[in-house]
Amino acid sequence: MPSCCCLLGLGFPSPPSALRILRRRMASRAFQLRLNPLTGDSEWLVVEEEEEEDHHPTPPPKQLLATTSYLDMLNDSARNRAYRRAIEAAVTDPSSRVLDIGAGTGLLSMMAARALAAVGGETRGGSVSACESYLPMGKLMRRVLRANGMENRVKVFHKRSDELKVGDDLDSPADILVSEILDSELLGEGLIPTLQQAYDMLLAKNPKIVPYRATTYGQLVESTFLWKLHDLHNNEANAADGVWLTPGEMERIVSVKPQQHAMQCDALEDEIRLLSEPFKVFEFDFWKRPDSHREANIKIQTTRDGYVHAIISWWVLQLDSAGSIFYSTAPRWARQSSSEGPQRDMKDWCDHWKQCVWFMQGKGIPATEDQVLSLRARHNQTSISYQLNINDEACDRSSKGDHLTLLPERIALYGDKDWRSALINTIKNALTVKSSPTCVVADDSMFLALLISSMSPTSKVIAMYPGLRDKGAAYLRSVADANNFSIDQIQVIGKRASSITADDLKHKKVNLLVGEPFYLGSEGMLPWQNLRFWSVRTLLDSMLSEDAFIMPCKGILKLCAMSLPDLWRSRSSLKDVEGFDHSVVNETLGACGYLPGDQQGPCLPYYVWQCGYTKKLSKVYSLMDFNFSEPIHSCFGKTKIEFSHDGTCHGFAVWIDWVLDERKSVVLTTGPDNRYWKQGVQLFGKPVEVNPGKSVMHVEASFDPSTGEITFSSSSTTCS
């Protein structure tokens, strides 16, 4: 985020009065970075803060907050209830000074203010201060406070907690700290440095802390699916197609990042073999200043033979000092086990806190029943890492310039035999009619650059690599010999399409324009944001030969009606949250269900297979075609859905099938049955009870080429 001094550093002295005015204006605005899905360019949005006396503030832009996890958190009743009980237990002194760091909508602050009032704090000098650095959320918090008559009982600071100062912002050090700066790994949102700074600068001696303690747990598992998510080398060896993304002696040149990866592991329960009981890893005592780094050596006795492919981890939060209020992110099988410790309340499915997966390298670590394995766990200020069998030090290329880290799903896709075969056969057919072609890889595909270069020694391959850039070039140099091509065949330009000129192509016409499509950094976006490939093709239109081969040649928007009760509940509109009205946040946070007028929540990206209980209620329908032989243009489509199963329809899943070769019907589908892709999920304004032969639904969609967005509308009818 640009700072005031950055904008003032123009080389001209500013008069003191102008400086004060600009500083005041900068203090009341923030800049939100947004990625344009069709160009890959970053765009700045300005978020203004209203003056204190403005009692009718403009809500923050919907798109800024609708894709966050705030709504899911506020629908997590177990979490809300646990925090309320713990705060009420902590606030017993009417003179308490409460500080809420990372206040969000202000829910915890309002709980503290209510608890303070209950013990007479309003007349005894008690106070509540809320710190929220993200201005769009801070604006929303002020609306929530006003809706609940709390605007004068909670003091709001749009600052990071390390910018707060006792004496300037806070009248005196706080003696109660409440916070929820936790992620699925526990530490990833900066919990430790935030608490350290608070203990050093903002808190009184011996403060009360909510939550009081957290304990992390782990469990050794065997899972073919999890193995495929990280072991590219052995999976592409099984494919045996001659293309080596990870040649011998370079097994780790493409890998997942060595970190904990958040995942809904309950969805894998039936295909996971547990190789150990749950074991305790670290205990974090928040009631005292936390350490930055620690290490633990743990002995784990295995419970059966198998290969350790991963460690699944979770945490248990103790919110009160008495040890009576807990919240757990454990998977279902561990919550049902008594070995974890005190019984935890069963809770609803939620998406904001998942379990985490730490992958073992290669084929996994072999284990026999009752074997004792040594695990070394380390944590720093923001993450926890593991090393199983301490003497088994693996080669780590991560510091080398040719090493690439990808998301687990991309690793699995690159090792998938069917996916590779579809691309190989399509490119092979294209090259039979192209002599010494000039080929442009229009995305960040390493696979296609290697494939074409190795299949066609006379080809000239121009890899755009707008995300990989120099790292992609270094990688290709490292694996060229193993794939039997000269690196001189490939030119990595590292540019977006809007910056490419005929000079970059040596004034040659492009015979092949190909993509997976895959754009580094865009993996979590909605499926149609990969239509960036269509935008690139349009920008390169004048550089294409008349008979240019384009792959994929078409995208088909598909959809399927779904029952999604767990996802619906987590995204449903809010009313009362532990006694506080949150209805003002619904539109901004993208809630669904029973909203005024025809409002509906946004279409959001999810791995549908991880969305709790799901059921398909219809067959798959085609809704819209995108023809890449033409320049990008607006599109419209509609279809009638006839239901094949009884149930409650909460919305539909939508995705794009990529047609690689229309003549040979080579299609890559990315629907819910394919677990390596996210789908878009459009939830309805109200759930609909459906019956085969009696219920139909009409769905329309339109694509706007200027924004890359697709909008949906739907209506249902019941036949007598």
From Swiss-Prot:
It comes from the Eukaryota. Residues 54-385, 387-720 form the SAM-dependent MTase PRMT-type domain. InterPro entries: Arg_MeTrfase, MeTrfase_PRMT7, PRMT_dom, SAM-dependent_MTases_sf. It is an enzyme of class 2 (transferase). Keywords: Methyltransferase, Repeat, S-adenosyl-L-methionine, Transferase. Pfam families: PRMT_C. GO terms for molecular function: histone methyltransferase activity; protein-arginine N-methyltransferase activity. Its EC number is 2.1.1.-. The active site is at E180, E189. Belongs to the class I-like SAM-binding methyltransferase superfamily. Protein arginine N-methyltransferase family. PRMT7 subfamily. Arginine methyltransferase that can both catalyze the formation of omega-N monomethylarginine (MMA) and symmetrical dimethylarginine (sDMA). PANTHER family: PROTEIN ARGININE N-METHYLTRANSFERASE (PTHR11006), PROTEIN ARGININE N-METHYLTRANSFERASE 7 (PTHR11006:SF4). This is Protein arginine N-methyltransferase 7. It comes from Oryza sativa subsp. indica. The lineage of its organism: Eukaryota, Viridiplantae, Streptophyta, Embryophyta, Tracheophyta.
